From Swiss-Prot:
Feedback inhibited by histidine. The gene is hisG. NCBIfam families: hisG, HisG_C-term. One of its GO terms (molecular function) is magnesium ion binding. PROSITE patterns: ATP_P_PHORIBOSYLTR (PS01316). PANTHER family: ATP PHOSPHORIBOSYLTRANSFERASE (PTHR21403:SF8), ATP PHOSPHORIBOSYLTRANSFERASE ATP-PRTASE (PTHR21403). Its main location: cytoplasm. This is ATP phosphoribosyltransferase. Belongs to the ATP phosphoribosyltransferase family. Long subfamily.
Length: 304
């Protein structure tokens, strides 16, 4: 066993992620890309960090904010909607959230929206007055209604929100929307945005001051490198000096061009990191502008 994994429990960083669901696999993949590996326990709820003293807890997504607030975990990857729902609920009871979103992690994008039966003729939020709205996010919805100056009844449901209008338990719903297919299947249409959401890395407001502080800083730096490179490619090519300005204008989403040592063929050797899609059409456009020997390379890791 290495010295790092033999560290006492209080010096080990602990991260909570969803055990199953749409955020589970992307979260594990992101952390693995940061160089983390684990040994899973028999109950499959705890994963002991092997490459670094960073352990995983596999839990329900709605447990993650509370685990951070109570100091059980240092970090968690959770939907921003779940984080805000519990923060809003704590505010209503006069409690501080004790956690915050450290950064977005680039997946799990969705929208919390109001959706009404397809036969409704929607004119605006004034129609919500006196209506019953079913949702799994009562605190977010209540805050939103208050900001809109609308009095409506919030019907809290833990699941199957989309069938509430057909069952007669609500007039409309407030639910997460990704593709909209579930709404369409239940004869509902989205009409009003309540909040945009994505998966975030959440952490305690008070960061650890012991050995975990160094681990946290290292993990965040690695994660920034992974996220920056997720949609990036290294582009290499040769070009005459007179063509460089025109080529640079075709790369607005790229880092400044870096000149490499001359290869003796009279042309400049250049490279840059592109942070957008590098399509065949884009390569052909660069070629027409004077780029030669174009190569697109995947970059796995970077420390900026």
């Amino acid at each position: 066993m290495s010295a790092s994994t033999a560290a006492p429990a209080r010096d080990r960083l602990r991260i909570a992620i969803q055990k199953s669901g749409r955020l589970a696999e992307p979260a594990r993949s992101l952390l693995a890309a940061c160089g983390l590996s684990w040994r899973q326990s028999r109950d499959k709820l705890f994963c002991y960090g092997e490459s670094l003293p960073v352990d995983l807890l596999l839990v329900r997504d709605d447990d993650i904010p509370g685990l951070i607030a109570d100091g059980v975990c240092d970090l968690g990857i959770v939907g921003q909607n779940e984080l805000e729902e519990q923060a809003a609920e704590r505010r209503r009871h006069g409690l501080p959230a004790a956690y915050h979103a450290v950064r977005g992690v680039g997946f799990g994008q969705c929208r919390l929206m109001l959706a009404v039966p397809e036969e409704w003729d929607w004119h605006g939020v004034a129609q919500l007055a006196g209506k019953r709205i079913a949702t799994s996010y009562p605190a977010i919805l209540a805050d939103w209604l208050e900001r809109q100056g609308i009095e409506a009844t919030v019907v809290e449901l833990s699941g199957s929100v989309e069938i509430a209008p057909r069952l007669g338990t609500a007039d409309l719903i407030c639910d997460l929307v990704s593709s909209g297919a579930t709404l369409a299947a239940n004869q509902l249409k989205p009409v009003e945005l309540v909040m945009e959401s994505e998966a975030v890395l959440a952490g305690a407001v008070r960061e650890p001051a012991d050995a975990r502080a160094g681990l946290l800083a290292m993990l965040l730096r690695r994660m920034d490198g992974v996220l920056k490179l997720r949609d990036s490619k290294l582009l290499m090519f040769r070009a005459e000096q007179t063509k460089v300005d025109a080529l640079r204008r075709l790369l607005p989403d790229a880092d400044p061009l870096v000149q490499l040592p001359d290869d003796g063929n009279g042309a400049l050797r250049l490279q840059t990191m592109c942070h957008g899609a590098v399509t065949w059409q884009r390569l052909e456009e660069l070629e027409r502008a004077g780029a030669q020997g174009l190569m697109v390379l995947t970059v796995e890791r970077s420390l900026a």
